[in-house]
From Swiss-Prot:
Binding region for DNA: 421-440
Protein name per its UniProtKB record: Transcriptional regulatory protein ZraR
Organism name: Salmonella typhimurium (strain LT2 / SGSC1412 / ATCC 700720)
Gene3D superfamilies given in the database record: 1.10.8.60, 3.40.50.2300, Homeodomain-like (1.10.10.60), P-loop containing nucleotide triphosphate hydrolases (3.40.50.300)
Taxonomic lineage from the root: Bacteria, Pseudomonadati, Pseudomonadota, Gammaproteobacteria, Enterobacterales
PROSITE patterns: RESPONSE_REGULATORY, SIGMA54_INTERACT_1, SIGMA54_INTERACT_2, SIGMA54_INTERACT_3, SIGMA54_INTERACT_4
Pfam families on file: HTH_8, Response_reg, Sigma54_activat
Positions annotated to bind ATP: G172, T173, R329, R359
Amino acid sequence: MIRGKIDILVVDDDVSHCTILQALLRGWGYNVALAYSGHDALAQVREKVFDLVLCDVRMAEMDGIATLKEIKALNPAIPILIMTAFSSVETAVEALKAGALDYLIKPLDFDRLQETLEKALAHTRETGAELPSASAAQFGMIGSSPAMQHLLNEIAMVAPSDATVLIHGDSGTGKELVARALHACSARSDRPLVTLNCAALNESLLESELFGHEKGAFTGADKRREGRFVEADGGTLFLDEIGDISPLMQVRLLRAIQEREVQRVGSNQTISVDVRLIAATHRDLAEEVSAGRFRQDLYYRLNVVAIEMPSLRQRREDIPLLADHFLRRFAERNRKVVKGFTPQAMDLLIHYDWPGNIRELENAIERAVVLLTGEYISERELPLAIAATPIKTEYSGEIQPLVDVEKEVILAALEKTGGNKTEAARQLGITRKTLLAKLSR
């Protein structure tokens, strides 16, 4: 793994203490960032890579234990050292139980501090817990669920290699985020990452985008253009929705991968390229091969390493963290003070099935923040499809008829729309006639 200097985040609401630590740590060769509150620390961890966090326990608003837990939720691998006054050693023990790697007594013994820092960083390298040169949170990959931890482990293992990767998952699960993390954590990270959505272009435009074209090769080609393969030379090429390309483009892409060279449209000259290829699709390419719609040889070339993206409903325990992440982002963007979600609103978010996955959650939170007039997001600000979600309770042994469940959802939708049957039907994705028929059963 290629690394630069070690980045340390110091979290303490004592500005003078922060300044002293910053000067000391910089003298030891570390890069140092300062956060004067827990909320500031979380904002920085979301945006930047840190190899270690040094956090005080006693802080106003959000104390060190709460900050520790939130940082661990964003990035379970990051080592955190807690600073505490001698009189609060019990709190330090609590911090260790919550995931702190070690604690330091204030006023700090600088020799002990240096020794503890070196041990913490060495421990992280030895255990392999260190995220590579970019943290998951930096790419919006937030969560502590088993499914998310499995995905992050796969990225950490696969990123250093040059193997072609095929990412499969439903729309909105974050396939491009994984591609960006794989590139950023690779030895090619200082070279370009070039992306292309194959489904957005017809065959002729896709060929020109991938391989480039000569001046005059077709109508409108008023100058020569390099393709995405050449632009990505030395770096990574990410092809999204690879399952949507035509049979002819499959042949040309296969040749480029096999020969490691491309040919501009309208040219006989070949150009050697060195790229790592990452492809993504929502389609089952094995099924597409069986159906004769996708070349088997290209499938094998792409499917060297397969990464399966979990849907949001497979990692419901991550929804509160993701919702909070989006809430903070959109509250800041809209210059609003939003303190959080009501318990009822969070229950709805957790129980909704999210067919659009993380992208749908992000859009729902943005809408809620824009519509919000108070301090807490409630079910009133959520889209109707989410607000009408039945909250699943502990199974009582009695099966409720499907017709009753449907009626409950429709009644909730009608309440939400003030009795407007047409609007309720529209937001539920059914016709008004179907809604009336289900109500009359």
